[in-house]
């Protein structure tokens, strides 16, 4: 075994390919923290929330609905940032800008914040685009979008993980069947 490993390590292309594969697979195991349409962490009033891990209805953040909060909506972002002000339904952009210093209408607010993954799209998130899909790479979609306006990079990350996990499971099952039969 040691001789085989030594020969493998001497083949630089094979050795570096193994390292690239291991790193890519390791990164893909944390796909939810890298590419997701839910925030990693939300601070709202006195609490911390992790929408990647747990379901939170919009009511948790001062909204009206019992369904899951759509964190990408400007109104939900306004509710979180301003501590649940009901004026967020009328002029969310203005309130978010005013909330930057922690004061709105000369009153202090419990300022909240949101930590997003580097790629704020899940593999199934359909994006609203200014042009027809598929779209070329831009600042929002680093590798562009596919023909149904979904982020290509997010789909690659999740697809790579799914493909490798499937290959590992098939290999283990085939080996087990081959040994037992």
Regions found by a protein language model. Give the residues of each.
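Gly/Trp-centered helix-boundary motif
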Residues: 1-175, 179
């Amino acid at each position: 075994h040691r001789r085989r490993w030594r020969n493998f390590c001497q083949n630089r292309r094979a050795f570096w390919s193994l390292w690239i594969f291991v790193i890519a697979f390791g990164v893909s195991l944390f796909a939810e923290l890298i590419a997701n349409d839910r925030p990693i962490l939300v601070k709202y009033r006195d609490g911390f929330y992790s929408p990647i891990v747990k379901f939170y209805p919009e009511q948790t953040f001062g909204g009206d609905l019992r369904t899951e909060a759509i964190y990408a909506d400007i109104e939900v972002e306004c509710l979180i940032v301003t501590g649940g002000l009901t004026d967020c339904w009328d002029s969310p952009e203005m309130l978010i800008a005013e909330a930057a210093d922690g004061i709105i209408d000369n009153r202090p607010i419990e300022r909240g914040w949101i930590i997003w993954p580097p790629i704020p799209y899940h593999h199934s998130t359909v994006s609203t685009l200014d042009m027809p899909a598929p779209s070329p790479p831009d600042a929002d979609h680093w590798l562009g979008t596919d023909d149904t306006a979904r982020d290509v990079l997010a789909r690659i990350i999740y697809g790579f993980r799914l493909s490798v996990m499937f290959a590992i499971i098939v290999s283990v099952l085939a080996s087990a069947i081959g040994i037992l039969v």
